[in-house]
């Protein structure tokens, strides 16, 4: 009942069809896009559930002990990462797939920048399963924060805050 109410609310609010699924398997099998953003220590779905043509964005599991994607997901996918060296060191699920021998580091097809600049091919055909594995790049976060800050200042938005310990203690709810 809660899931149906939430689906109705989301449909109304965003003007898209939202409907509850009976299982993670059903959800994954019926999705063109699967996004995971978890701190899970074990896979949240099975790669065998993915249909041809699906895109997976795995943006969690950003530490060696975490694993939101299974080896089968990596094995079946064209793998793209944000920054190869960092992802190979930090993405627990990718590291697990490599250490289990399901894939090798050479199976990482490209960095996202290589696809954007045309140095590497993206999706080769409509049946290919693609996977973007991201652990985040701090310099991109800083650049984004600086851009947002500059835009807010230019538009007179936001509020000044002191960041000393006393101010922070007094502002706690």
Predicted ranges, named:
Residues 14-18, 125-127:
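A short helix-to-beta-strand connector/capping loop
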Residues 33, 171-172:
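Anionic, Ser/Thr-rich low-complexity intrinsically disordered regions
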Residues 66-171:
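Adenosine-phosphate binding glycine-rich loop
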Residues 10, 48, 152:
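Active-site catalytic pocket residues across diverse enzymes, especially alpha/beta-hydrolases
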Residues 16-102:
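Rossmann-like adenosine-cofactor binding region
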Residues 1-14:
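NAD(P)-binding Rossmann-fold cofactor-contacting core
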């Amino acid at each position: 009942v809660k899931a149906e109410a939430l689906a109705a609310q989301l449909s109304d609010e965003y003007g898209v069809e939202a409907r509850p699924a009976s299982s993670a398997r059903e959800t994954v099998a019926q999705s063109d896009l699967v996004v995971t953003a978890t701190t899970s220590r074990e896979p949240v779905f099975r790669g065998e559930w993915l249909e041809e043509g699906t895109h997976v964005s795995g943006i969690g599991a950003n530490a060696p002990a975490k694993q939101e994607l299974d080896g089968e997901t990596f094995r079946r996918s064209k793998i793209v990462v944000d920054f190869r060296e960092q992802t190979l060191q930090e993405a627990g699920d990718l590291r697990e797939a490599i250490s289990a021998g399901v894939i090798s580091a050479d199976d990482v097809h490209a960095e996202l920048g290589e696809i954007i600049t045309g140095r590497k091919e993206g999706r080769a055909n409509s049946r290919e399963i693609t996977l973007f594995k991201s652990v985040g790049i701090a310099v991109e976060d800083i650049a984004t924060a600086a851009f947002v800050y500059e835009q807010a200042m230019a538009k007179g938005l936001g509020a000044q805050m002191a960041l000393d310990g006393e101010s922070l203690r007094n502002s706690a709810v």
